[in-house]
Amino acid sequence: TRAFGVRLDLGVAPVFIDTTGDGDLGALAGCSFEYGESDSCPCQPMSLNALLVVKDAAALASVTHASDPSAKDNLAKDAFLAEIKRAGLFPSYSKPTLWQVRDNLMLVMMNHEYGIKPFDAAQVTEATVRARGELNKIVNALRKLGGPWEGVQIAATAEQIGVRDGRRIAGRYTVNKDDLVAGARHDDA
């Protein structure tokens, strides 16, 4: 709806609850909002992950993130980046990560899209298309390396790119750092 200039008719119901995740309803109702950290700091990057099917996940152990907060995980990310570079590419996300989901099904994160307004449908669509293109280009290049990458395929991606940082509707009160430090409680929460 955000792409079509929809206006909100407040007379339809006594209460509206915005569950869009992007603050669309609040924005349509005329509420002010912010996004990013400040005017000079854009939103966090968006990313599109993919599920990959590989021939032998065990053969990719050196590039697979173990979800362990040890230095080994950074080594796996660096090794995965080295493989992408060996294929002649450099991903938009400089810490690409590969996880084993189960058996020969892997999850990959190697794309970031920067400076995209999360409430602009055209920008989100363009970012999604670019991200899919990048994922396919990298996977195709890895496949050409052969070895453990032989036959690697994208099994699935999300419907659209993942948004980390959308609108934050301005409410009656904004929780701040001091509230968090003090463990503040609010009667209406």
Please annotate each region the language model reported.
Residues 2-15, 19-189:
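Flavin (FAD/FMN)-binding glycine-rich loop and adjacent Rossmann-like elements that form
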